[in-house]
Amino acid sequence: MSVSTIAAERRTIQLAIDTGVIALRGLSPQRSRFELEYALERGSTANSVLFAAGDVEPAVLVHPPGAAYSSVFLPVLAEQLADADQALLVVVGHVNPNRVALLRDLAERYSKLELIASNAGAKVLAELWTQRKPAPPGQEVEQPPLPDL
């Protein structure tokens, strides 16, 4: 199965936990039996929690997925947080290049994005933030600045 076919089959579902608390679970039919496949080291799902506090307090997003889920995750998040000027705190539990790519997308959309990470995580975030694949001459893309940590 091609990478584009697998990506097209991914989706993000919303599970209301309580008023203002929403679980955003990224699913793939290729990984529908999470516990068994995880035990066999064949993959996992992407599970995030959004605390939407309303207009007064910032929203808090815990453990956003990596870029592999960006095409299905970002539109669902935008439904919940339509105001791009709303403050958004993002708790980053583990850092890798795939996750940093999605965080860059969030930084482009939400101008008041703040990242929350451990000291070690913040150092890795700062190093990975500016890394990118080389672009052909004349096709360089401006990246958003690293949000406050």
Feature-to-residue mapping (PLM):
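Generic hydrophobic alpha-helical membrane-span motif
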Residues: 26, 100-102, 120
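Active-site environment of divalent metal-dependent phosphoester hydrolases
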Residues: 31, 95-100, 122-125
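Metallo-beta-lactamase
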Residues: 3-11, 15-19, 110-149
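Short, low-complexity, polar/charged sequence segments that are solvent-exposed and flexible
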Residues: 41-45, 79-83, 109-112, 134-138
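Conserved beta-strand hairpin/beta-sheet module of binuclear metal-dependent hydrolase folds
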Residues: 11-79
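Active-site metal-binding motif and surrounding structural segment of the metallo-beta-lactamase
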Residues: 65-116
